[in-house]
Amino acid sequence: MGKSINKVRGTALILGILAIAFAFFTRIVSIFEYVTFDIGPDPDQISGAYLWMDMWKGNFPQLGPPGGGGKYGFTIPPLYFYLGFPLTIFGADPEFQVLTNGLFSFLSIPLLIYFVYQLLENVEQDKRLLLSSLAGFWYSTIYADYFINNFSWAPSPIPFFMLVFALLYRFQMETSQPLLYQAIAWIFFGITVAILVSLHTTTMLIIPVTSVIASLWFVYRNRKNTLKCLLPFLSILSANLALFMYWHSEIVRNFANTKGLVRALTEKGASAEPSSNLFTRLFKAIWETVYLGNQVFFLNDNISIFNVVVSAIFFGISLYIVIKKYRGNKTLIGFLAITWIIFLYASSNYPDEHFYSHRKILLWFAPILLAIASLAYLNLTKTFDRILGLVLIIIIGYSIATNLYFDQRYLASKYGSERLLSVADTVEIINQIPVGSTLCDPAKKGKRKEHGQYDYIDTFMTKRELMITNACPSGSYYIQPKFKMAIQMNDLFPIFTLAKTSPLDRPMTSLLETPEAYLYKIE
């Protein structure tokens, strides 16, 4: 028996170490091969880079990125920019701007292990340790989390702060610590709310509702203690103080952003009109949950009916077991369940367009927590429970395997023989171009006309005083990456493939070849 226990603990330790080591390499180390500084239709990373440099000049943002994909005339609060700002003290390199995301993603792995351990009450110690480590390792392999935390993007830190959000609420509901500690926890609860509403439109709309419901439940549970009932007001105060710059802007602008948000939520035509049919809305909420498996947990280059079926079986079994057998911490699971239900209600109103995986980021932990809780409370002395457990383990293994495959592809695009051009590679090439030369950039148009990637790199890093233009006159220089990222801008985002680039249809002289690119001079 003792040897069996030692094996379980040893396996738990190995899984925990693997989770943290893999997360450290993918979320921290590989950031410095930064290949996503300029991807997609919008140059968000470049715009953010300029904004952080402006902050060093004393220009502090009062509003954040556009909400709702920039289609509805409102923005989210600006705290993401303030989260990313401190690490830019190390330099203007874009890698330091994304390092904050990498750190939060890395820290979310041990935090998830701790969270799951707290969740699995009434489970024997060794099993609890093993399943907590399994949850951490599983999440460390999630390709979608790896990808979005390897470039500068506001939604990326949501998983970390959701864990903090839930753990703080559990502390408030269950602690016997002195009132001072409870007051401090409520202050941090409010700051966490302020951060979460500053990361994405979904959190901006859903987290305040969750926090109000949670606070009202806290007040109800402590209704005989007047002083404790006043504690949630500390979170309201701290949240609004954290959002001081945003509220200052709103007051000065006569609440223009709030009015834009209200218009987006109420005006017909701002989005597809939601169905009033209860069955239709319920089906959409269920479908978007099941389809999350195809987007985050069971990956394929194309939409896969097989993966959708696997996801449906997986969710069905997990939900059935948790509803029937769960005996863990009710505060944590209840808090998350409220958030998930509010999100699912909101998703049933979502217009019929691409529902990208990052827009479902509040659900990302749900499959992991449901599956791990299911394994924790199955009675493995019963044949039926053993069969269910085996099915779940096989599906979890399949999820880890498919994600590791896409992790490997992403790593190969950074370190393989056929790889993308990184910021560091670009700097090395630009340093070979004579000072004051003209650099041809065909992408410098539309949203990139003002600020393209070469503009930023030369202004703040290489300082070669280049003239960057999309006109490409004779005598100008042209950098041709050997490969580009062909990313799927649909429900399968951020899956991508490498595509060979085509040379300019101009006579050119080759000056330099690196493993990632060519440098030409246009004749």
State what each model feature region is:
Residues 49-54, 207-223, 228-315:
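Transmembrane-lumen/periplasm boundary regions of multi-pass, lipid-linked membrane glycan transferases
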Residues 34-37, 69, 389-432, 441-462:
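Membrane-proximal, lumen/periplasm-facing interface regions of secretory-pathway glyco-
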Residues 28-33, 45-72, 79-82, 89, ...:
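Extracytosolic helix-loop segments that constitute the early lumenal/periplasmic catalytic or substrate-binding loops
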Residues 16-20, 129-130, 375-407, 419:
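Signature aromatic-anchored transmembrane alpha helix within multi-pass, membrane-resident enzymes
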Residues 21, 99-123, 163, 167, ...:
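Transmembrane-helix motifs of polytopic, lipid-linked glycan transferases
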Residues 205, 331-383:
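Hydrophobic/aromatic-rich transmembrane helices and adjacent perimembrane loops
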Residues 144-156, 202:
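Short acidic/glycine- and proline-prone juxtamembrane loop motifs at membrane-interface regions
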Residues 78-82, 90-109, 133, 151, ...:
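Loop-to-helix entry region of an early transmembrane alpha helix in multi-pass inner-membrane enzymes
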